[in-house]
């Protein structure tokens, strides 16, 4: 039963390392991208386009 704690610790390390590097990359990229308003408009236009091209099953 000594294997379980070791597996758990290795899983934690494997999960935490990519999460930390991703957070650092995200914070670094946030300085470069335009203000949030433009970014939200971009996401909204993408969502509306998806809604038109993929109607929900009830609208057939």
Swiss-Prot record:
<keyword id="KW-0165">Cleavage on pair of basic residues</keyword>
<feature type="propeptide">
    <location>
        <begin position="37"/>
        <end position="60"/>
    </location>
</feature>
<feature type="compositionally biased region" description="Basic and acidic residues">
    <location>
        <begin position="36"/>
        <end position="54"/>
    </location>
</feature>
<keyword id="KW-0929">Antimicrobial</keyword>
<dbReference type="GO" id="GO:0005576">
    <property type="term" value="C:extracellular region"/>
</dbReference>
<feature type="region of interest" description="Disordered">
    <location>
        <begin position="36"/>
        <end position="60"/>
    </location>
</feature>
<keyword id="KW-0732">Signal</keyword>
<feature type="signal peptide">
    <location>
        <begin position="1"/>
        <end position="23"/>
    </location>
</feature>
<comment type="similarity">
    <text>Belongs to the non-disulfide-bridged peptide (NDBP) superfamily.</text>
</comment>
<comment type="function">
    <text>Probable antimicrobial peptide. Has no inhibitory activity against herpes simplex virus type 1 (HSV-1).</text>
</comment>
<protein>
    <recommendedName>
        <fullName>Antimicrobial peptide Eval151</fullName>
    </recommendedName>
</protein>
<keyword id="KW-0027">Amidation</keyword>
<keyword id="KW-0964">Secreted</keyword>
<feature type="modified residue" description="Arginine amide">
    <location>
        <position position="36"/>
    </location>
</feature>
């Amino acid at each position: 039963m000594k294997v379980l704690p070791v597996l758990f610790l290795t899983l934690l390390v494997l999960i935490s390392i990519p999460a930390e590097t991703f957070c650092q990359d995200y914070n670094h990229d946030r300085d470069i991208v335009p203000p949030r308003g433009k970014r939200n408009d971009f996401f909204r236009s993408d969502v509306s386009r998806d809604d038109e091209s993929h109607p929900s099953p009830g609208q057939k």
